[in-house]
Amino acid sequence: QRRRQRQMCIRDSTKIVQKFKNRKFHITPFVSDCGLSYGAAAFGASLWHDVKVPSNLAFLGRRYLTPLEIREENLDLKKVAQYLEDGKIVAWYRGRSEFGPRALGNRSILMSPKYKENKDILNEKVKHREEWRPFAGVILKDHLQDYFEEGIESPYMLYSQTVKEDKRDKIPAITHVDNTCRIQTVESGFLSLLLEEYYKISGVPVLLNTSFNDNGKPIVETPQDAIDSFLNMNIDYLVMNNTIIGKN
């Protein structure tokens, strides 16, 4: 209001974004109590400076060195994509951790969305949670309009969007009973490259994306957290930065 900008800064639903299509929306990825610290910092900064939102806003965790016993190499994304197409469960650990409640591709568990039973497998054998709970997805941004009615770009996975009728049988593992899905859009980075490889193999530019943790436990933070969780959960592969780790 001070600068007479016709913009809104809110935390609200997909319907509001659709209704006010001519307005610009800034919804932070911190849609839980942890957002209070960001709000206080942003407000304080605005009193003395012009606030510039950094591009890596969602990834404010520490950066860790890979354990010395793990040898870094060039990551074979084609191999990882084939694992996913074969129905394997892949834990994905890269860079700085997410700040907020959503797994956005740095501390994620990934699986193919093509098979309805994958939802039950993850709920029962991996996450150990109620069978009715849905899973989110991640999609290449260029294909968003092909799969979702609203087609709202969402790099922070903030909106539940309606899966188009002709696509519901292609991604049943992430299509909820009301035909919606909370979807994340990506257009760059390693997760985007993995999606491109998966799309070449499967014809589907979407993956199931859920947080890398067991039920009742926090999302993994350190490399040691990731290794411990990988060994104690029913996960087939751990991709840690540029290294693929399997189980004997």
Functional labels for PLM-detected ranges:
Residues 1-10:
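Single conserved hydrophobic/aromatic residue that forms the stacking wall/gate
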Residues 11-248:
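Flexible beta->alpha loop and helix N-cap segments adjacent to enzyme active/binding sites
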